[in-house]
Amino acid sequence: MKERIHDIYRPVGERRHDFAEVEAALDEAAVRDQMLRCHHCGIPFCHGAGCPLFNRIPDFNAAAAEGAWLEAYRILARTSYFPEFTSRICPALCEGSCCSGVNGEAVMIRQCEKKIIETAFASGWVRPFVPPRRNGRRIAVVGSGPSGLFAAEHLNRAGFAVTVFEANRKPGGLLRYGIPDFKLEKRLLDRRLAVMEQEGIVFTADTRIGKDVSARYLLRNFDALLLAIGTPAARDLAIPGRELAGIHFALEFLQGQNRVNGGELAAPPVSAAGKNVLIIGGGDTGSDCAGTAIRQGAASVRQIEIMPRPPEARSPSTPWPAWPWMLRTSSSHLEGCEREWNIASDRFIGDAAGRVAGVEVHEVVWEFSADGKPLKPAPKPGSDRTIPADLVLLAMGFTGVPETGAAAELELKRTPRGALIPEPGRRIYAAGDCANGASLVVRAMADARKVAERMTEELLS
């Protein structure tokens, strides 16, 4: 039986000079080998404990392995409207719960999903789903990111007339402006949006709700309002020197390059070309910044993280089938990004012109629980040093929804963590990150489906 394939990327020397998808396409035989590995579990945990969408992974793998690709696509499409997105940008929670991963390596479920959906598109099986009849109700969806698009698709299939509003020039939200092309080429997004438009979903872009159009206007003219606006408020680093030039939020940096790639700008507003780049924050957004900076021609790229270095294998603190805490190395890290853990930032250092020139940091030592979970850090004496940098990117996550726009106009209450509290009694709903806090694309989609189901039940009862 074939094992998991680890080398799935295009050559580093090739991919670091373009924004094309970093992953090389696996041929049908290689994917089939992975699908056949899926048949060795007794009770599958991948689609229950793992996938938030409850994709029927063993079923679509079994169908495709037997050559029934159309049936595999039909099984996948019953639970996932946009597998071409999740098969590229999801961390594959399903693989963390794969039975093959208990004593070995998980099946490459994400690659199997990608092969199925791309085969479906190439074969002409992905067709617009136009509901047989409309129910006479109109829904306004504010935000066209993962949760907004997923909810719009679900509501449209239920017979609602759906209009999706987007503040940016083009629809897609985070998928278009926040995720680099080397992970998700925008032609894939445009391909799906074209299908959705043929289904009758209306997209109104370049429209800021709460400024260009009031949220109350939407409530007067639609039967319900669904906010799917994400959590764009980035977590800041309030240390001395924060006012220096050359310190930017990660999303600002990523959006600029994506707008260049999409033809909206001639040059990125924030460029890493020729600079020593320091990324503060060790998550996926920081990794995306690293890959983008490398492609822009940065002199050096370093990513620092206050958390400890994860173990090479699953930590006992996250036993199977939980999502494992363990070291993960992205395609961007392999392209020339240095990584450091246990690093806390103290002060930004500036030059005579008022630009950032470095960051004073110190190391921390973590206290761990008996099963290896990091509990709290303490400064390491004598570890102070300065990391040179003339471009600093803050990638430390997001704090919630800003006190502006539709949420402010509607005077919605918030949780202690800044998430919006929907008010169905006022016909106001919220889905995805704005209602739950920043999380994964696939979790935002799963929540959008749950909210759309609730809206359907309440509005048609």
What label would you give each PLM region?
Residues 2-24, 36, 54-66, 71-77, ...:
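Beta1-alpha1 glycine-rich phosphate/pyrophosphate-binding loop at the start
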Residues 116-132, 191-211, 234-296, 410, ...:
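Glycine-rich dinucleotide-binding loop and its adjacent helix/turn
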Residues 36-39, 277-279, 421-445, 449-450:
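Short FAD-binding loop at a beta-strand-to-alpha-helix junction that anchors the flavin cofactor
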Residues 36-59, 82-103:
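Local cysteine-cluster metal-coordination motifs and their immediate loop/turn environment
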Residues 187-235, 258-267, 294-414:
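A Rossmann-like FAD-binding core segment of flavoenzymes
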Residues 228-229, 250, 280, 389, ...:
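Short, well-ordered coil/turn residues at beta-beta hairpins
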Residues 1-34, 84, 104-137, 242-256, ...:
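Extreme N-terminal leader/targeting segments of oxidoreductases
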Residues 286-291, 296, 434-461:
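A conserved FAD-binding loop/helix module that cradles the flavin
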